[in-house]
Structures are given as structure tokens and as C-alpha cells.
Amino acid sequence: MPHEHKHDIFCAGRAGKLIGFLRRLTQNPYRILKPYLKEGMTLLDFGSGPGFFTVPAAKLVGTSGKIYAVDVQQQMLDMLVKYADKKGVLGNIITINNPEHEIGIELEADIILAIYVAHEVPDRDKLFLSLKKRLKPEGFLLLAEPKHRVTETEFKETLEIAKKNGLEEAGKFKMVESRTAVLKKS
């Protein structure tokens, strides 16, 4: 019997925790993203929050690349814009506020990030179908969920939903205190 799916949204008022020094130390975004991102690529950061992965991704893809940052909370995107501007990478980041947990734009991405967000989305079938539609045939979706919020059983259920919607597991990536999977189109 499936577990009840939690979908509480992380409060923007606590966003400092999402980009703080301790998280950068334990979940270094450059170390996580570098094996997947090259200059000129397009990345979709679904549930970008204040830009913990978005800003490093923008540096890795360079000025010839494009980053789409999608979040349900405009306050998170406002923080992301300030952070990206401070780091000098705002020029290749497009922010999209969509309170309906949708992407809201047609695009094709080399890499899609869904980091600490799937458990917040009420309709994960719709989520994975939408993400698959925007993933290039040779692209990868990096999925991570926090161990303190998502049990191993719940994460396996999430992977089954992804599989049902045309994505298969192609591996894992290392991220402290997280359950992870690298997904590709099946």
C-alpha cells in the first residue's frame, strides 16, 4: 500500500539554510554538477529555490549556455536574482514563477535538476511527464530528496512514478544526506 505523499513547500523565510556555508561544504554544487554540465548546455532547475544549484550551473555552462530556474515562490526567485547578480551570472538565467508546480515554458534541456522538490509536488505523474517532455533524448534528470523528509520506500515509489512516465534510472550521484538518482528517457 503506497504511503501518503507529503507536499509541504519549503518556506522562503528559511531560504538562508538552502544557500548557507554548511550546505555548500557538505553538498558542493560544483562537485555534483561538473560531471554532467559542459559549456553551452541548457539546464532546467525545477524547484530552484534561492539558487543553490542555479548559480553554480550558470557558471559551468558559461555565457553560451542557458539556465531556466522555475519555482512556485516568487520570493525564492527574487533571492536567486540577487545571488546570481552578485556572482555575475544573471545574464544567462531565466526565472519562471509558476505557483501551479508546472514549468510554464517549452524548452529542451540537456540537464534537468529536481533537487529536494518532488516530495513537494502534489501530482508527481504530471511532474515527471512534464520533465521528460523537456529533456533532450541524450539528457539526464538529476533527482534528489532529503533523507530526513523522504523514506527509502517513498523514494522508491517516486522512482516507480518516474519509470511509469518514461524515465529510467541510469545511476546515482553523491549528495550528503540525500536519496539520489540519475534518470534518462527510457
What are these language model-derived features?
Residues 7-26:
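Class I SAM-dependent methyltransferase Rossmann-like catalytic core
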Residues 23-41:
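Conserved alpha-helix/loop element of class I SAM-dependent methyltransferases that forms part
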Residues 38, 101-112:
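A short acidic, Gly/Pro-enriched loop at the edge of an enzyme's catalytic core
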Residues 44, 50-102:
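Class I SAM-dependent methyltransferase SAM/SAH-binding core
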Residues 110-123:
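A short SAM/SAH-binding and catalytic strip from SAM-dependent methyltransferases
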Residues 125-137:
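A short glycine-rich, Lys/Arg-flanked "PGG" loop and its adjoining helix->strand segment in the class I
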Residues 138-145:
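Conserved beta-strand signature within the Rossmann-like core of class I S-adenosyl-L-methionine
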Residues 165, 174-186:
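Core SAM-dependent methyltransferase catalytic element
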